[in-house]
Amino acid sequence: PNLAWQGSGYVDCNAGTVPLESTFSGWHWTRTDPINGESWIFYNRESVSGAKEGLTLRYTDGGGLQRGIALDDGPPVKPTPIWRCARPVARTSGPSRIIKTLEDTPFYARSKMAVEHAGEQYTAMHEYVDLKRFSRPWVQRLLPFRMPRRARE
């Protein structure tokens, strides 16, 4: 197909033999926009057993990749305005704040954020998935219906 886009983007997928909520209770990640050819990804997940695991990746100009020290969760930012979905964030070297809520559903939030890390102020994309909430019967009953999205700029 003839596809093209402008701006930042990413591709992700989930694959496995069991439903995600059988293994994970949730996860959140933050991906910074590049500054001087450097971008960060902070990824934290929690298994249904309560075990937590994190990953920090630093991408550099020219395709370099370095694995960093996993960051614990920092103070959460404000929950989403409609469904009150939590938005935990990794404990970077400075405060994080919401710039704009892009997706606000009962179990999922996507937000544009301001993040301070390693002495730089980054604009970042943040995602949080709450699979405990996803598994609740009231949320399951809502799944056939599309959740409203905010208008794109």
Label for each model-derived stretch:
Residues 1-153:
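Structured soluble/peripheral alpha/beta segments that form catalytic or ligand/cofactor-binding pockets
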